[in-house]
Amino acid sequence: MEIKGKVHCFFEQSGTFKNEFIKLGIPAEDYDIQDNFGQTDHIVDLFSHIEREYDKTRQDKTRQDKTIFDDITKDDLIVAFFPCIYFSSLSQMEMSLTDVNKRKMPMNERYEFVLNRSRNRQKFLELLIKLMGVCELTGKRLVVENPWAMQTYLKNGFIKSPSIVDNDRTRRGDFFVKPTAFWFVSCEPTNGFTYQPTDMSKVKNVRDAKGAKQAGICSEERSMISPDYARNFICDFILGKKQDIGQLSFF
């Protein structure tokens, strides 16, 4: 894929990808609702921008309701690490009335908890669909990331099958095995594989990571991406660029 413009990295932890794009000579900026690492270029309510931009695609296109998408062209690329807090396999366990974390809750509170979580999950699902719709309907290029473990909610009849599933991210230098899906919208991935295995002493378990502090904000520790993985993913699947490290194969 040729990127003549800029890369726009959305949501938490996207700064790692931003930095690696810049190292590869491609201009990049990141956007998020918070700035916990002091490096976010644009602190914005991404959900609001997605909602408003989707409305523009199906209503009057002459509306002056400006969003961040107005400055993104077809020569650019959006890389979105969409919040997985309601889609991950760990999240699906929270939908059970008998989940161990609810053992001290009265039954009426358990029902309210599950119903509230179900409503939030539907809201986030619609936002993800709208983000993909905005890009497909306007021809803007997008790569969306989300977990793809056994019980992941998005396996249950999502609107598109993933373009790529990376079943073991440690093979490309990440901290977690963490099976992950990537959807390429208005573009196609390249198919390289740079083998750079992570030292086993540095591999982490998702279940041991700290949870999120509030709804809509993913766990920082679970969402962490190593710079090595970001660079290898960019070169293997976005740029089709052979590197001088590791071993590159094609499948």
Segments from the language model and where they lie:
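Conserved active-site and SAM-binding loop architecture
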Residues: 1-251
